[in-house]
Amino acid sequence: MTWRERFIDFFGLQKSIVALLFMAIFVGLGEKMAERFLPIYLLALGGGILSVGFLNGMDNLLSALYSFPGGYLSDRLGYKRALVVFNLVAMTGYLIVILFPHWLAVIIGAAFFLSWSALSLPATMTLVSRSLPLGKRTMGVSIHSLVRRIPMALGPVIGGVLIGLYGEKTGVRLAFVAAFLLGVVSLVLQQAMIEDDHKRGNAEKKPSRLWRFMSQDLRNLLVSDILIRFAEQI
């Protein structure tokens, strides 16, 4: 086994996983480059402080609500098709913000692309679990979490540069144009590199029924996670 093969095997860099990592970079870069400056953009468009507060509240709410449809569509369509749908939804929101420079249009568009990470997380974790053997799944999740930090660091810097060069209104709109184009690149990579998911079609419509399928350890983890996040927000 060559050093390249050992490297690929150690980090679990299967073809679908590599595509997922590129998607995390491209979509995440567009998301962080534009989304972080939405409050500034709202104020520049005359939305006022209340619109900024509403945007932040909507972001927290959608982060919770989007998780279930994200999981349902991932089970129903398969992770590959679900990721395509999620990207198209986000790109629709980007287009609304680009084409209609009004604070109300920004709020409407934001409903499509806010909390993309929460919406896509179930499909992402399903892809990792089905693409990698049991002994490499933790490594796959770790690499994905690490790579996601790259756009988190670079996105706001690039967005800030655009605002500095072109002003608050034009700079933010250009950031959304870049986010849309990066979404297109991500779609192309998904179709070319991610393998089809053949285990799809069965999806539970009622979240309450999922509780009885959980092991005791998973139930304990869920309860502890809820309590920790509640304490974190206090």
Model-identified regions with their sequence ranges:
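C-terminal membrane-cytosol helix-exit motif in multi-pass small-molecule transporters
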Residues: 180-199
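Cytoplasmic helix-loop-helix junction between adjacent transmembrane helices
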Residues: 111-148
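Transmembrane alpha-helix termini and helix-breaking/packing motifs in multi-pass membrane transporters
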Residues: 40, 44, 154-173
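Residue-level signature of mid-helix packing/kink "hotspots" within the transmembrane helices
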Residues: 60-68, 152-153
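C-terminal ends and interior cores of transmembrane alpha-helices
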Residues: 88-102
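Helix-loop boundary and gating motifs at the non-cytosolic
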Residues: 3-62, 217-234
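Hydrophobic core of transmembrane alpha-helices in multi-pass small-molecule transporters
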Residues: 25, 93, 104-120, 226
